[in-house]
């Protein structure tokens, strides 16, 4: 199964977008599925505030684990992680128009009305999986 397929599969199990992306890469990141699910659990729905999309924060966690700064003196790691962060976020915004959850979904998911809009328009089941699969 590809990473995209894994992420969509996790998301279809009612996991947060951030959990789905991070768990799809758990093996490559040297963490367990449980660790990935726990680490990503507070980042879904733009950290439950409609802010940065959980698929983006999940991807940033993956990039941090793969390329991140390993110590205070690891300036190369810091520079590399900054570079891959900017590259990923810029590409996501270019492809999707934004990396803000509320902007992507076209509503305020923190409100009852916004959440209802997403459910009624199948955004969580049809639109969000597209974010998972990049």
Which residue ranges define each predicted feature?
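DPxDG-like acidic metal-binding loop motif
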Residues: 58-66
């Amino acid at each position: 199964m590809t990473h995209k397929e894994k992420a969509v599969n996790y998301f279809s199990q009612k996991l947060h977008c951030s959990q789905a992306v991070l768990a799809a890469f758990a093996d490559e990141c040297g963490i367990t599925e449980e660790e990935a699910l726990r680490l990503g659990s507070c980042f879904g729905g733009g950290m439950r505030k409609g802010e940065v999309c959980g698929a983006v924060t999940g991807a940033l966690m993956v990039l941090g684990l793969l390329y991140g700064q390993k110590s205070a003196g690891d300036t190369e790691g810091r520079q590399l992680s900054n570079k891959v962060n900017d590259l990923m976020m810029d590409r996501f915004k270019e492809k999707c128009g934004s990396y803000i959850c509320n902007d992507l979904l076209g509503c305020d998911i923190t409100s009852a009305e916004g959440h209802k809009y997403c459910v009624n328009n199948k955004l969580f089941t049809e639109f969000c999986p597209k974010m998972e699969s990049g």
